């Protein structure tokens, strides 16, 4: 397959191809412009992959620009996390990082130009009055009583705003467009508002800050962006984007194109709702492995490659839709099935004693790190007469469909011996505390000599060599596919979204590092937690199960 054939095809790429073929543009220049007021989520990953991916494929450029026009909500912590997320996903921005605040002087000059042209005015209506005057979808707005001020008066009042002569909320600069427009965004939108707050880049130089719709288009033009890609909620804003650029003296006029945002089942993408989950401590932070944030997915064990593949599979369209969580999970499952080394861990342990195994002795059994990749090598795992197995892998009685250990019957221990359950010990409540077995000493990694068939295989960990591990079984944060539609989205949080177990792992897990996944054989894919794991306490997060159990539950 050629490079061109391997590229994804979508309507945005078709537009770019046409622009290049017609000579409208000779290069492609995109940008990713997040506001640094929170952590990026999987929806932002779609935009990152689109903007940076297009720049890569067309040998163009993609800027990382922080839309930092609201100092009250923004923080350098978010700037750093966003930079880290973009790099972790495998992308690199062109040149230096940009900030909308880099252009505050130019933005102010363009605002003055609009005033001089009679296209902007200082309004002293309150924010509540501005909303009231704006009208509704079915009723036109009405003009502010301050709309017809002279150019000279507006210039003087705008300067008064800039120098701190008004209190917050007492004045703003508005575009003079059309209060009867069928598009509410065009009903004299606010261009500048007053905020007496220190800015993380400009300090206290400014007390007036430009609005997104005024800043965004001018920043695109100043940077020479050829294709400004936004999600569909900004479709109506394109009219204002074009109006601003049409009415100022600027040589470049980028075009805005909209695509559908990513909606994912069993989670929320609203920054307000995500913030509420964090501040009300329903989760442990923005990087909680149940969160849809990139940092949360990374901590859970998702790889950058799996997220890029997910974004590639869902594609880019203008049609809003909701993606099944199973689609995201299948991407990480396929990635880790192919690349994760195997290990054995017992999540719900019960002791098994092999009564005829030499007492006090142990041996090493060789296990492949990956059943289909001999190049990944093998490891030596200690085996002894006392092992941990998973409680679910033993039954005193079972039907023929149960292929694990049953009283009086045989099963194979993974890469070790065939054993037979002989008896059990129980506590006062009737819970099994120990399973006693015998083993066939001539079956180490081979079939019994007499030809009898042993169908089941279970995993195990030697008691004498086991590493105590904490296992965090993460699941979907919400119990319904569309929590955002619930009257109270907090009421549908999945109470089983985190279950903590104390188990045992094989000794090789001592070398585990955060972010590197294992397949715990027969259990799922897990990675060492980056927050809670220490040298003395191993904590593993479940990234995803071996199979999509939610799909089965819904059938």
Swiss-Prot record:
Its EC number is 6.1.1.18. A motif ('KMSKS' region) lies at residues 268-272. A motif ('HIGH' region) lies at residues 34-44. Pfam families: tRNA-synt_1c, tRNA-synt_1c_C, tRNA-synt_1c_C2. The keyword Cytoplasm applies. L-glutamine binds at residues 67, 212. It comes from Salmonella typhi. Monomer. It is found in: Cytoplasm. GO terms for biological process: glutaminyl-tRNA aminoacylation; glutamyl-tRNA aminoacylation. This is Glutamine--tRNA ligase. NCBIfam families: glnS, PRK14703.1. The keyword Heme does not apply. It catalyses: tRNA(Gln) + L-glutamine + ATP = L-glutaminyl-tRNA(Gln) + AMP + diphosphate. Belongs to the class-I aminoacyl-tRNA synthetase family. ATP binds at residues 35-37, 41-47, 231, 261-262, 269-271. Its main location: cytoplasm. One of its GO terms (cellular component) is cytosol. GO terms for molecular function: ATP binding; glutamine-tRNA ligase activity. It comes from the Bacteria. Residues 317-324 are annotated as: Interaction with tRNA. It is an enzyme of class 6 (ligase). Keywords: Aminoacyl-tRNA synthetase, ATP-binding, Cytoplasm, Ligase, Nucleotide-binding, Protein biosynthesis.
